[in-house]
Regions:
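Juxtamembrane helix-loop junctions of ABC transporter transmembrane domains
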Residues: 20-21, 25-41, 62-109, 113, ...
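Membrane-integrated ABC transporters
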Residues: 1-32, 36, 44-60, 73-77, ...
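Pre-NBD coupling/linker segments of ABC/ABC-like ATPases
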Residues: 314-326
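ABC-type nucleotide-binding domain
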Residues: 326-572
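Helix-loop junctions and hydrophobic alpha-helical segments within the transmembrane domains
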Residues: 92, 96, 205, 306, ...
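Transmembrane helices of ABC transporter permease
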Residues: 10, 14-27, 66-68, 128-183, ...
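Helix-loop-helix
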Residues: 47-51, 147-161, 231-305, 309-310
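An intracellular "coupling" helix at the cytosolic face of ABC transporter transmembrane type-1 domains
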Residues: 10-12, 77, 98-102, 118-131, ...
Length: 572
């Protein structure tokens, strides 16, 4: 929790005030048994109604004060812990957005989700309970013992002798449960990942009749989580029964020994009644302290996981800039090599240049490095070797916002949000309606006009009420809407028929002459008009040139082109 002190510090004064109010409520609560003892042992024998009303009124005032102060403090603790958690979630979300793709690969999306939700919730609960019980329980414990020592030191020693037993139980439980709660959050990441995969791929799972298999896979991780939760719960479950049993033993001894002392004149009956009340307060205080330790185990484990992400060094910092190289190509890959894992190259010694307004086509088998080129150009990763330049400037020296504002991008299985068609194309950018219409027209998204409401027609989560081709055209319209300098289409026309694909390419050639376009596709027909085509295999370029050059010099390209041309006639 110490690692999150920057989030707690701004509210430290507010939290101290909360604790002071809680202290007032606790002190007024401690006064009630002593007032009762005075009434029973001094006021009642005197038969003075005025004193009975006076001390009775004082007890009532203390009870009301205790209620008001505790409610006030509890509300304040909820406000401060809520604001701290709000800032924590905000910074954690922003930090996740700044992490490189490589760091996110290591962290995993399910782990990021559970840290942003479950872990921050646990931190919130810990902060709130520390303010509510953290001052009240110790003050009740210490104050109760002090008041008991004032009344009868011999009876008080019985309780004091039992406290080390409870302290040992709390120490044992905390030591054993903290690693288990850390492990529990890690396994929770697996559960979230499994659920996420199943929900995302539910149609494929049903189509392949793999529902039973996925049930077994979920039951496996769910059983693992349940086992750890039960193990942690069985350890923490020791605390309350042990504390209650120990204190009840003490309570029994106090009643028995107290009865002998009353009979012998060693103390008054009111003292025994007050002792029983203080004993109940101390019992509740000890149980509260044990709950704090249990909550601390869970909250501390979560705080560590959150801090681990917040303290991650950002490995894609903008580097000091240099003067752009004169007379440089618009885009240049210069001897670029890259590996996702450090074992084997995903791209090896890749070099090519592209002038502004030209089109690059990338073709290759699965895993050949097509999408890796795009990820490097967008600087989702940095290359292990070599340079990537735009307008003669190394992209590592260009600020993120400035770099990525140049791009219009459509990835495979890209994000479609719930909302209107216009919202999805605009995507939180300041783009006029006329530009949205133009982008939709160029993307061949004529289906929009047939929808009820047109641009304001509803789109379901992940575009579930759209066909595959409609989704792709909607995403292409989004990429075109901002009139980007560089347009990236990663297999963005795979669901389009040949005619629509050809019309799309014609619109790009006619209306986006100054836009540099990079196409990744499986169809030769989608790339044949490109100024440069790269044929990749296992991260290496095995052919480079225009369509005619590759037909003459690259056997793999020629074979693929002839096979596809036999299936469909090119529509220009």
């Amino acid at each position: 929790m110490f690692r999150l002190k920057k989030y707690i510090s701004p509210y430290l004064g507010y939290m101290v005030l909360t604790l002071l109010i809680k202290l007032l409520g606790t002190v007024t609560e401690l006064m009630i048994p002593e007032l009762m003892e005075t009434i029973l042992d001094d006021v009642v024998p005197s038969k003075s109604w005025n004193q009975i009303y006076l001390y009775g009124g004082a007890m009532l005032l203390c009870a009301v004060g205790c209620l008001v102060f505790n409610i006030w403090a509890n509300r304040m603790s909820a406000i401060s812990s809520g604001k701290i958690t709000l800032a924590l979630r905000h910074d954690l979300f922003a930090k996740l957005g700044r992490l490189s793709a490589r760091q996110m690969d290591k962290l995993t999306i399910p782990s990021a989700e559970s840290r942003l939700t479950s872990d921050t919730y646990n931190v919130n609960q810990l902060l709130a309970r520390l303010q509510r019980i953290g001052i009240r329980a110790p003050i009740l414990l210490v104050g109760g013992i002090f008041m008991m020592l004032r009344m009868d030191w011999l009876l008080a020693l019985i309780l004091i002798a039992l406290l080390p037993i409870i302290a040992l139980v709390v120490y044992f439980v905390t030591r054993k449960s903290l690693p288990l709660y850390t492990q529990q959050q890690t396994v929770l990441d697996k559960v979230v990942r499994t659920v996420q995969e199943n929900i995302t791929g539910i149609r494929v799972i049903k189509a392949l009749s793999k529902t039973d298999y996925e049930k077994k896979r979920f039951h496996s991780v769910n059983d693992q989580l349940t086992h750890i939760d039960q193990k942690a719960g069985s350890i923490t479950a020791i605390t309350n029964p042990c504390a209650t049993w120990t204190l009840n033993i003490g309570l029994t001894l106090v009643v028995v020994i107290g009865a002998f002392r009353v009979n012998s004149g060693g103390c008054q009956p009111g003292v025994i009644v007050a002792f029983l009340q203080y004993f109940t307060m101390i019992l509740n205080a000890m149980l509260g302290i044990t709950r704090i330790f249990v909550m601390f185990s869970k909250g501390e484990a979560s705080a560590r996981r959150v801090a681990d992400v917040l303290e991650l060094p950002e490995d894609l910092e903008t580097q000091p800039g240099t003067e752009p190289e004169a007379n440089s190509p618009y885009i240049e890959f210069r001897n670029v090599s890259f590996s996702y894992t450090g074992i084997g190259k995903n791209l090896e010694n890749l070099s090519f240049t592209l002038e502004k307004g030209q089109t690059l086509g990338i073709l290759g088998s699965i895993g050949s490095g097509k999408s890796t080129i795009l990820a490097l150009l967008l600087r989702l990763y940095d290359p292990d070797e070599g340079q990537i330049l735009i307008d003669g400037q190394d992209i590592r020296t260009i600020p993120y916002e400035q770099l990525r504002s140049r791009f219009g991008t459509v990835f495979q299985n890209d994000f479609i949000m719930e909302g209107s068609i216009a919202d999805n194309i605009r995507f939180f950018r300041d783009i006029p309606d006329q530009r949205l219409e133009k982008a939709a027209q160029d993307a061949q998204a004529e289906f929009i006009a047939s929808k009820e409401g047109g641009m304001e027609a509803d789109v379901q989560v992940r575009g579930n009420n759209l066909s595959g081709g409609q989704k792709q055209r909607l995403l292409i319209a989004r990429a075109l809407a901002a009139d980007p300098d560089i347009l990236i289409l990663d297999d963005a026309s795979s669901a389009l028929d040949y005619r629509t694909d050809a019309q799309l390419r014609r619109a790009l050639r006619e209306h986006y002459r100054h836009t540099t376009t990079i196409l990744v596709a499986q169809r030769v027909s989608s790339l044949r008009h490109a100024d440069l085509i790269l044929m990749l295999h296992d991260g290496t370029v095995i052919g480079a040139g225009n369509h005619e050059t590759l037909m003459a010099t690259c056997e793999e390209y020629a074979f693929l082109a002839q096979t596809q041309m036999g299936e469909a006639e090119e529509v220009c």
